[in-house]
UniProtKB/Swiss-Prot annotation:
Record's GO cellular component terms: extracellular region
Keyword Secreted: yes
Organism: Pithecopus hypochondrialis
Signal peptide, first to last residue: none
Keyword Secreted recorded: yes
Expression by tissue: Expressed by the skin glands.
Protein name stated in the entry: Phylloseptin-H10
Phenylalanine amide modifications at: F19
Amino acid sequence: FLSLIPHAINAVSALVHHF
């Protein structure tokens, strides 16, 4: 689960970068 947290943060970061 801990390995999944950074992935989620990266996805959100990419989303914010897109907008």
